[in-house]
Amino acid sequence: MFFESRPIVGVGGGGGACGGLLTCVGRDAEGKGGADTLGREILELFLWWLLCAGLTEGICGLFCGTFGAEAPDNGSGGAGDDGTMGIGGAAEDGISGIGGAEDEGILGTAGAGDNGALGMGGAATDGTAPGIGGALADGEGLVLALLLICFNFGIPPAKISPNCGAPIPGIGGADIEGPLLLTVPELPEADETTPPPTIGALLSLVSAFFSFIPFLMSPNRASRPCITDFAGLGALPPNAGGGGGGGGAGAPAISTIRYIYGRLLQQTVVRFLVVCFVSYQKLSS
C-alpha cells in the first residue's frame, strides 16, 4: 500500500507555566497557552481582611474605648438623656446598651458605674465586684482582663487558665479573698423594667467569627489550578513526528493565600495589642 502524501509535522501541545499568585498559565483546547486569573482567591482574601480587621477593631473600641467611670460619648452610638441609645452611648439614668456609661451603675457590656454593679468590662470607682475585664480606679488588671476575655470566648488557646489558680484584683468574683466566680450584676429593686446586662450578642459574634474562618481557609474552597491534557494524535503517516506533550499544570495558589492571610492577621493582632497597651498607660496615668 501507498501512504497519502502529507506534510511531516507533529501536533504540539501548548506549554504550561508554573502558576503564581495572580495567574496560572496552562493549555486550552486549541493547544495554546491560556491564563486563569484567580479572582476567587483574591476576593476571599479581601473579605478575610475586612472581617478580621473590622471585628478586631470593633472589640478594641468596645473594651478599650469605654473604660473608666462616667466616660461620656464613648464608642459609637452617641449619648442620650433618656437612656435609649445604641452601642457605645452614655446615659444619665442608667439605662444603656452595650458599652454605655452612666451614674446609676445599671448597664450592659463594657459599661462603667459608680456603685460597682456592672457588666463585663466596666470600671467601678469603689472597686466592688467588677465584672470580667473590669479595671479598678487605678487601672489595675486591665491587660490581664483582656487576656481573660480572649481565653474564655473561643479565641485559641481556649484551655489555658486565665488566672493560674490565683485570685486577681479587678477580675470577676464575689470578693478578692473569696472564690473567683463570674459576677452577675443585680438590678435595683425600684426599677423592675430594666433588662439585665447581657453579653450573649458579643459571645455569639466572636464564636461565629472563629467558627467561620476555618471554612474560609479550607483548601477545598480554592480554585482548581489549570489542568492541561495531552495533545491528541491524529492519523499520521509513519514518518510524521509525534505531537508534543501538554503543558504542565499551574501551581495551586492556596499556600500563597494562606501566607498573605497570616500576615494580615498578624498585623491586626499587633494593632489590637498596641491599642490595649495605650489604653492601659492612660488608665495608669
UniProtKB/Swiss-Prot annotation:
Highest taxon in the source lineage: Eukaryota
TM stretches of this protein: 197-217
Compartments in which it is found: Membrane
Keyword Membrane (UniProt): yes
Topology relative to the membrane: Single-pass membrane protein
GO CC terms of this entry: membrane
Alphabetical keyword list: Membrane, Transmembrane, Transmembrane helix
Disruption phenotype: Leads to overproduction and excretion of inositol into the growth medium.
Miscellaneous field: Partially overlaps VRP1. Disruption phenotypes caused by deletion of this gene may also be a result of a defect in its overlapping gene.
Record's protein name: Putative uncharacterized protein OPI9
